[in-house]
């Protein structure tokens, strides 16, 4: 069986579970379950701490896992990044007290940086020629300055509300942009059939979220103009209608552009334009 690690908690957990469920995998029914066998899909799911997933995958104990791009880099393991999963977006930023003179990266020189990502911070500072001391903390990083443990922090930021509430302000350029990723053990063949099947399913889920089916009727002489507007992935499906002067068109279009495309199609003569959600795909 393909051994898949999924986050057992945190901001990545529920979107990861939902994505796997939409891809047809069986999830745990009891929150106390740590391992779930899914013989129909030839996989085992292991519910692990997000921080540990890259370590297990890098060691080859687990074949593949879902974790954050930032967590993967901070782990320093040999786990290989396979694909972005489209959720869990965040940035990794420096933050200092509101009244602190620390306002640029150069000001970090000689300072103590509270963080849960000490390797990532160390590598970033070294790359930029800054000599500072990362202080490893497992949680509540934003409290480290007030408690006198650090002069500033480096942490994952989604909205910035937590930092502002702690009297901290973001400064400098983002250290890193991150999102959820699928990672693979270096011991697993990248062409392993089970891995390829998993990736096809996850790509299918992403496509179903980002695209919709659009159906419309169009005068035959306007088909070329309509296809220019909605070319689809390979080519639209075009079918003749009872009235030979009209044709029916079915095509996949980006969900974010639906209304603009409907307007453009209407303007070239399309009528009866209908949009339908996609439940699943294989592209």
Swiss-Prot record:
Known SUPFAM superfamilies for this protein?
Answer: GlnB-like, Periplasmic binding protein-like II
Tell me the GO molecular function terms.
ATP binding; ATP phosphoribosyltransferase activity; magnesium ion binding
**CC cofactor:** Mg(2+)
Annotated Gene Ontology cellular components are: cytoplasm
GO BP terms in the entry: L-histidine biosynthetic process
Q: Which domain of life is it from?
A: Bacteria
Q: What catalytic reaction does the record list? A: 1-(5-phospho-beta-D-ribosyl)-ATP + diphosphate = 5-phospho-alpha-D-ribose 1-diphosphate + ATP
Q: In which pathway does it act?
A: Amino-acid biosynthesis; L-histidine biosynthesis; L-histidine from 5-phospho-alpha-D-ribose 1-diphosphate: step 1/9
The subcellular localization recorded is: Cytoplasm
Query: Keywords for this entry?
Result: Amino-acid biosynthesis, ATP-binding, Cytoplasm, Glycosyltransferase, Histidine biosynthesis, Magnesium, Metal-binding, Nucleotide-binding, Transferase
Keyword Protease recorded: no
Q: What class of enzyme is it?
A: transferase
Keyword field contains Zinc-finger: no
Which Pfam family, an example, fits this chain? HisG
Name the Enzyme Commission number(s) assigned to this protein: 2.4.2.17
- Activity regulation summary: Feedback inhibited by histidine.
Please name the NCBIfam families in this protein's record: hisG, HisG_C-term
Q: Which family is it part of?
A: Belongs to the ATP phosphoribosyltransferase family. Long subfamily.
Question: What's its job?
Answer: Catalyzes the condensation of ATP and 5-phosphoribose 1-diphosphate to form N'-(5'-phosphoribosyl)-ATP (PR-ATP). Has a crucial role in the pathway because the rate of histidine biosynthesis seems to be controlled primarily by regulation of HisG enzymatic activity.
Protein name stated in the entry:
ATP phosphoribosyltransferase
Task: Please name the gene that encodes this protein.
Answer: hisG
């Amino acid at each position: 069986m393909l051994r898949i690690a999924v986050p057992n908690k945190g901001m990545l957990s529920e979107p990861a579970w939902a994505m796997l469920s939409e891809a047809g995998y069986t999830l745990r029914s009891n929150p106390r379950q740590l391992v779930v066998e899914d013989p129909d899909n030839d996989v085992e799911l292991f519910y692990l701490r997000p921080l540990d997933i890259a370590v297990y995958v890098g060691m080859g104990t687990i074949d593949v896992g879902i974790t954050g791009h930032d967590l993967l880099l901070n782990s320093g393991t040999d786990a290989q990044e396979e694909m972005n999963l489209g959720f869990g977006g965040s940035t990794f930023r420096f933050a200092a007290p509101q009244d602190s003179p620390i306002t640029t990266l150069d000001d970090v020189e000689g300072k103590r940086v509270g963080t849960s990502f000490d390797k990532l911070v160390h590598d970033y500072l070294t790359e930029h020629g800054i000599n500072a001391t990362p202080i490893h903390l497992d949680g509540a990083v934003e409290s480290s300055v007030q408690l006198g443990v650090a002069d500033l922090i480096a942490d994952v930021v989604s909205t910035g509300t937590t930092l502002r509430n702690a009297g901290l302000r973001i400064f400098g350029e983002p250290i890193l942009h991150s999102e959820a990723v699928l990672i693979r053990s270096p011991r697993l063949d990248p062409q392993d059939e089970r891995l390829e099947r998993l990736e096809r399913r996850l790509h299918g889920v992403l496509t179903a979220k980002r695209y919709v089916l659009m159906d419309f009727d169009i005068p035959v002489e306007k088909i070329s103009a309509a296809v220019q507007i909605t070319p689809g992935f390979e080519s639209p499906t075009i079918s003749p209608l009872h009235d030979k002067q009209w044709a029916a068109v079915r095509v996949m279009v980006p969900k974010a552009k639906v209304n603009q495309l409907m307007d453009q199609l209407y303007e070239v003569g399309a009528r009866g334009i209908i949009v339908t959600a996609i439940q699943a795909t294989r592209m």
